[in-house]
Design a protein with these regions (language model features):
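Catalytic, metal-anchored helix/loop core of enzyme active sites in primary metabolism
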Residues: 45-53
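A short, contiguous, amphipathic alpha-helix enriched in charged residues
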Residues: 1-7
Length: 604
């Protein structure tokens, strides 16, 4: 009977060319087959079954690629909660809250309510930490890196917390409206439940849930040999290049290990937030004297040079796109509201000061705090995301971007002497008018050539720009006269095309828009083909009409979204760039897009 059953099962699998879940019975010594259907499977099983069936000749490699979804590949890249443990937690009433699932994976740790506490507990005490904040800012990055996961009460899919979490592969849940954070009492509250700092919580960034207590996790195997083989097949069929966003050499190494063919975005401003560098940045911002500003920039240069050299060494033989400073300067300074509060506290303490020494010390602190506050107020803008940032900052403070370009080319010359094949590409952000790019490129390319002359070394390089504004997309033919490449920053391009705030929309009207079918998808998660996609199409066609070899890529968060990758393939982009942790997903999605396009062409 067993032999007969084995033969029938084999025949069914061969006929349906799919793993089967069969029901049978044995009555009076006779085998009866009751029904058969395609079997359910885990992500690991789906990959292995597809590869084995292709190797057995039951299906083609193209079919094997098509049978595995990008979401199943994503499972291999992040810890997940044990299913039974999660169900038990639900049954016990331990599901605390839900928010936006902005960075996949499961994380368990104690609550830390600020970045310094998160870093101290994680590095000095060896604790697993979940950093919980109303929202994160650039000066929270050190705590975010130390934490196992990130939880915020505000923010959307393209908020600072979401972007950084995806960049560094940290599970994150944001926009948890029910979460009330009391920094004074060092506790959080959801409805009537209070969680104190130091209590254990578990967050699921894959589906956006928060649990009290510790849930068991499962760590998948990234180097699964079946997955490695399937992705190698995917690489044979995809046309789109897949690059990685990386600000540090370890991120670049991870991206390359996952199959990235270049760095599509290095955010230089992230390098400024290291503890030993931020005071130099503050000095540069605080002074109005050119000599003092240059001294601060000269002190920053070696840090930037070392960072770039590390990236170049890891990416030996592959392109590295380095974006010059993008955010407005006030983002590097203390928060305006915090400064006002601190100043008020100091003045209250001054009223109650008992000794002359204490009075003098407080007066000095008040004077310095007031100086910083005035500078921050001078830098403040009503709409900083459309204010003095990107190329505008480089034009107003040319010595800042000149320092960055010098650091890039000094690093490139150094590593080339070591035998490294270095390929820097300098990206100027937020261009809206061709003359901005023309002016900046002239200044910066002159500095690059000056460094190469000083070092007596020639470097193959490119200068390009980000297309983040509708005007830039519509005038890409003019921009292409001065750009060797363009890269779509689709976060800002979506924001400026729709005229909505990416930081506010996902916790506001956008949810209702999607629930009521006003918008089919979240445009910050998947490219809006009719609007943003149309602008991209215009830019690619206009740009390549002037320069047929124009390299066109995408480095926004959409670069790791399978639906957006399909649109990028359709538009003829050169590459997509995404978080290192999304590279395997993007490789498979790019193959899906290529195979789907081929089927449409042949009508099969």
């Amino acid at each position: 009977l067993y032999s007969e059953f084995e033969q029938i099962a084999e025949r069914l699998e061969q006929h349906y060319r799919e793993m089967q879940d069969v029901e049978f019975t044995i009555e009076k010594g006779k085998l009866w087959m009751l029904q058969t259907r395609d079997g359910k499977r885990t992500a690991q099983a789906a990959v292995r079954i597809a590869v084995e069936m292709a190797e057995e000749g039951l299906i083609t490699r193209e079919e094997a690629i098509g049978r595995v979804t990008p979401e199943q590949v994503d499972f291999f890249l992040h810890p997940q909660f044990d299913h039974q443990a999660k169900e038990a937690a639900r049954s016990a009433g331990n599901l605390l809250a839900a928010g936006l699932n902005v960075s996949p994976g499961a994380a368990v740790g104690v609550v830390a309510l600020d970045a310094d506490m998160a870093e101290r507990w994680a590095t000095k005490d060896g604790k697993a930490v979940i950093m919980v904040r109303p929202e994160t800012k650039p000066d929270d990055v050190h705590g975010m890196l130390a934490a196992e996961g990130i939880l915020t009460s505000h923010g959307g899919r393209t908020s600072h917390a979401a972007l950084v979490a995806r960049q560094f592969g940290k599970p994150a849940v944001v926009g948890v409206a029910a979460l009330k954070i009391d920094l004074g009492a060092r506790q959080i509250k959801v409805n009537d439940q209070i969680i104190k700092e130091g209590d254990w919580i578990s967050i699921d960034g894959t589906i956006g849930e928060v649990y009290t207590g510790k849930l068991a996790t499962i760590v998948p195997e990234v180097e699964d040999r079946w997955l490695v083989k399937l992705l190698s097949w995917a690489d044979d069929y995809r046309r789109l290049g897949v690059w990685a966003n990386a600000d540090r050499s370890e991120d670049a190494r991870r991206g390359r290990n996952y199959g990235a063919e270049g760095i599509g975005l290095c955010r230089t401003e992230h390098m400024f937030f290291e503890a030993e560098r931020l005071p130099l940045v503050h000095r540069m911002i605080m002074t109005d004297l050119p000599v003092e500003r240059q001294e601060a920039l000269d002190a920053l240069l070696p840090f930037q040079r070392d960072d770039f050299a590390g990236l170049f060494r890891v990416m030996d033989g592959l392109p590295v796109i380095i974006r010059l400073i993008d955010p407005p300067l006030h983002e590097f300074m203390p928060n305006h509201v915090d400064l006002i509060s601190d100043l008020a506290d100091l003045k209250i303490r001054l009223k109650h000061a008992g000794t002359l020494g204490e009075i003098n010390e407080l007066l000095e602190q008040i004077k310095e705090k007031d100086r910083v506050l005035k500078r921050v107020e001078n830098l403040r803008e009503d709409n900083p995301m459309l204010g003095t940032r990107g190329v505008r900052l480089g034009i107003l403070i040319p010595e800042l971007t000149t320092m960055q370009v010098r650091a890039i080319f000094e690093a490139a010359c150094t590593v080339k002497e070591e035998g490294v094949d270095v390929r820097p590409e300098v990206m100027i952000p937020l261009t809206s008018h061709v003359n901005e790019l023309k002016v900046q490129r002239e200044v910066l390319e002159a500095e690059a050539k000056k460094v190469m002359t000083e070092q007596d070394i020639e470097i193959d390089y490119k200068f390009g720009t980000m297309i983040e504004l509708p005007r830039a997309a519509l005038t890409a033919d003019r921009i292409a006269e001065y750009a060797d490449f363009i890269s779509f920053g689709t976060n800002d391009l979506t924001q400026t095309t729709f005229g909505i705030s990416r930081d506010d929309a996902e916790t506001g009207f956008l949810i209702e828009y999607m629930e009521n079918g006003i918008l089919p998808d979240n445009p910050f998660a998947t490219i809006d083909r009719e609007g943003v996609g149309e602008l991209m199409d215009i830019a690619v066609k206009k740009g390549r009409a002037v320069n047929p070899k124009l390299e066109c890529g995408i480095c926004g968060e959409h670069g790791g979204d399978p639906q957006s990758i399909s649109i990028c393939h359709e538009l003829g982009l050169t590459y997509v760039s995404c978080s290192p942790f999304r590279v395997p997903v993007a490789r498979l999605a790019a193959a899906h897009a290529a195979l789907s396009g081929r089927q449409q062409e042949t009508g099969t």
